[in-house]
Amino acid sequence: MSCEVLALTEELINRQSVTPEDAGCQQLMAEYLAPLGFDIESMVFDDTTNMWARKGTGGPVFCFAGHTDVVPSGPAEKWTFPPFTATQHEGQLYGRGAADMKGSLAAMLVATKAFVTKHPEHSGSIAFLITSDEEGPFINGTTRVIDTLEARNEKMTWCLVGEPSSTTLIGDVVKNGRRGSLTGDITVKGVQGHVAYPHLAKNPIHLSAPAFAELAQTHWDSGNASFPPTSFQVSNINSGTGAGNVIPGDLSACFNFRFSTEVTDKQLIERVTTILDKYDFDYHIDWTFNGQPFLTDSGKLVEATQSAIKDVTGRETELSTAGGTSDGRFIAPTGAQVIELGPINATIHKIDENVNINDLAQLAKIYEGILQRLLA
């Protein structure tokens, strides 16, 4: 198992699938799954390649979800080894996507083969939902596949997303939920003028600063047992011509909420609008809703995952909702139980991204153990 998962991870890393490119990764996966009895369906939407593969027609349905695309490598000369040439060094496997998340994809394949070989007449169905649009704008990836599946009433019971959830040891953290995400792009209109004649101008920086201060100091909620309090962060502010003697005519800013299940996106929008309307300036906001918070608090999937990790590693796992968003936010609203479990995330998106080779073999065994507990 360890040799096979390593070889597959290397093959995937060597395919330069910078988002939204798939670079043949899904074809490799399809060729691996087809002999195991999977029906393969390619769903191409614009520049994005997706794969829905399924073995079985009945329920319950266990789905592995993941992505073949990776973020750009950055300057290749800053890497110790070429970013798109998988390289083994001192027990680690280096390459872009090693941890996020080609190692997980390889482990899913090997685990599935091992399980199906032992249990050819397993109950229910096993599925794979794979996209090349997770690291990009997430418009034509998982969300479009889910729309297609929902239209034909094809449901998942359980879904394991292979995002790198572990922090210091494989399986030490499992994501059983994620916060929601809401982005606002605001434009504040002023009147440009000379700094020596402020009475003839309207400075959008001065006009909006008190409002931004109030937004930053607002207590949105207290969180709950599963989620921290909702966070508001301004990520960008731009205004001015660059000249020291010109009052700017407008201001643009971007801010983001990461919110708990204690509030909704509509409630946040209403509260922001109420605060801004207290101040006398002209503004416009374009809202981008990135996903609702979701939580898989308990159930067979969480229990099977905790048990499999304990069996393979001997350790208890921590359930967490911390961190950014994932494609789990598109899957959870269908009613599926969703968790995320993958390699250590310390080097993801960084120069010299790498994964521990032994961890890959353990991850495959954990994945197989989850299948064993749910579908054997």
Curated annotation (Swiss-Prot):
The keyword Amino-acid biosynthesis applies. Its cofactor is Zn(2+); Co(2+). It catalyses: N-succinyl-(2S,6S)-2,6-diaminopimelate + H2O = (2S,6S)-2,6-diaminopimelate + succinate. Binds 2 Zn(2+) or Co(2+) ions per subunit. It comes from the Bacteria. Belongs to the peptidase M20A family. DapE subfamily. PANTHER family: ACETYLORNITHINE DEACETYLASE, N-ACETYL-L-CITRULLINE DEACETYLASE. This is Succinyl-diaminopimelate desuccinylase. The lineage of its organism: Bacteria, Pseudomonadati, Pseudomonadota, Gammaproteobacteria, Alteromonadales. The gene is dapE.
